[in-house]
Amino acid sequence: LCSLGDGPFGDSATQYFVGSFDGKKFICDNQPNVTKWMDWGKDHYATVTWSDAPDNRRIAIAWMSNWQYANDVPTSQYRSPNSVPRDLSLFAVGDGIYLQSAPSPELLKLRDISKKRSFRVNGTRTVKELVPGNEGAYEIELAIRNQHADVIGFRLYNDKGEEVDMQYDMKEKK
């Protein structure tokens, strides 16, 4: 893993290399024209991993901030937190080996209230409260069956007017 302060997504980014290391020399298996990124956002930096986790797992956590605005973020609540712990593993596609990550299973112990909703959306749908009375963190699991949209997404917002948009481009597959 290599953290960059001048990445292609708007500053902070983490690039990774796959290969073999004999204790002295690293031989990179990446094709020269392929750059591999750990995350597609600009708030993933200074990744730290642990190799001695149970079951020989590789767990990573990153700093979620960006020097373009790190000093302008308010100092309360959500300033420059760490990412959720992720289990890292490699998988092969064609002639390349890639990194995948998934939230570490220990996070399941943090779950409390669960509420499931199922509905169809044609255009826009607003859900006022995900879990009434919850003022903490949310975990959202989506199963989306798309029939016609080029881009799908959702927006989370609060009473203060703060919002986060998530989008997925069906054609680009990202």
Predicted feature descriptions by range:
Residues 9-18, 84:
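Structural motif
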Residues 1-3, 16-17, 46, 50:
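Short, well-ordered alpha-helical packing segments
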Residues 22-174:
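Beta-rich accessory regions
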